[in-house]
A protein has these predicted regions:
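N-terminal beta1-alpha1-beta2 module of alpha/beta enzyme domains
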Residues: 1-63, 156
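Short, acidic/polar
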Residues: 13-26, 46, 76-79, 162-173, ...
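Alpha-helix-loop-beta-strand connector modules within alpha/beta enzyme cores
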Residues: 44-70, 119-123, 127, 198-202, ...
Length: 334
């Protein structure tokens, strides 16, 4: 799979109906994937969004992130099989690790994120075959589970969302591909892909069959500074108290050159002083310039090309604001 995708789900002002409409428009313009991010920020849920998108489109590959443990693996497999049926076999899934921060958010006891992700993926894949299966792991345990309907496909691709070195290695070991995080530079992407590629090789798997996708934050305006300001809020979310513990350090350890350790305390102090507004104001232009594709149409095209040059096969583009969505589709139409 190669090409350009369209991403939604992070903007709290965009309704499910609006998301589905933009997915349809993306399909009309030759985009290859529509992707929804179900986030720890408690925006819209993935099942509702993908049902709407599935009914609004006919050819677009559709996918979403879903954090494991929040849903039982049987429920996740059942939902995935149902959505794959609804869409005529167009689904991919990005099951993500339940970090300690996620566990705290959802009132769960912390359990090893790599272990739970691996077991959820293994269990879901077995259930998706349509056979009667039992699974007994450290965390996941069930007997005699079988879908009561024949799945459209017995294997739906899993693009594992990963940010840290551990997550990237795990994606190479168990995924059909990887979905690299948003708010990352092309330099980070190149480093991350090298880690994944090594893990694929060590697992004895075929790199040619592996899919590399990434959500790329895009902000298109006629004025460069205005484009930076439109997407600065999304960069800031990666440094709020919810996401900071599992985002900043892991990205730096992979080699993200635009996050400076000395800035972390500044972001924390800004949040304590004035919440989201103060945090957004504290994010330097260099962060926005480096870790998003923001600027004029030509500047954004050039930046997205740098992600492809780094090895990303499917650049999944997410507009920073609703008023930019149409322009993004026009700029990147096939």
């Amino acid at each position: 799979m190669e090409g350009v995708g369209f991403a939604t789900g992070y903007d709290p002002t965009m309704t499910v109906r609006e998301m589905a409409d933009w997915m349809r428009k993306a399909e009309d313009r030759g985009f290859v994937m529509g992707f929804f991010s179900e986030t720890i920020e408690l925006n819209r849920d993935s099942v509702s969004a993908l049902t709407a998108a599935g009914l609004a489109t006919e050819r677009l590959v559709l996918g979403c992130t879903q954090t494991v443990r929040i849903r039982n693996p049987l429920v996740m497999a059942q939902t995935l099989a149902s959505l794959d049926e609804l869409t005529g076999g167009r689904m991919v899934l990005s099951p993500g690790a339940c970090t300690n921060t996620h566990a705290l958010r959802y009132g769960l006891e912390p359990i090893s994120p790599p272990t739970t992700l691996r077991e959820w993926v293994e269990a879901m894949r077995q259930v998706m075959t349509g056979n009667n299966v039992s699974y007994h792991g450290e965390v996941v345990n069930f007997d005699d589970a079988k879908l009561s309907f024949e799945p459209v496909r017995q294997h739906v691709p899993f693009l594992i969302p990963a940010t840290s070195r551990t997550g990237l290695r795990l994606a190479g070991q168990i995924g059909d591909g990887v979905m690299l995080n948003a708010v990352c530079s092309p330099e980070y992407s190149a480093n991350a892909i090298a880690i994944v590629k090594q893990a694929v090789a060590e697992a004895g798997r075929d790199w040619d069959d592996f899919i590399i996708a990434q959500i790329v934050n895009c902000s298109i305006e006629d004025d460069h500074a205005a484009a930076l300001d439109q997407v600065r809020w999304e960069v800031a979310t990666k440094f709020d108290p919810i996401q900071l513990p599992f985002i900043a350090g892991p990205k730096m350890r992979v080699g993200e050159p635009y996050i400076r350790a000395e800035d972390i305390s500044t972001f924390e102090e800004a949040w304590k002083r004035g919440g989201k507004k103060a945090l957004v104001e504290a994010v330097p232009d260099s962060y926005v310039e480096g870790m998003t594709a923001a600027g004029t149409p030509d500047e954004v095209r050039e930046k997205v090309a740098r992600y492809r040059d780094a090895g990303v096969q499917v650049t999944v583009l997410r507009p920073a604001a609703k008023h930019q969505a149409q322009r993004l589709l026009d700029v990147f139409a096939a």
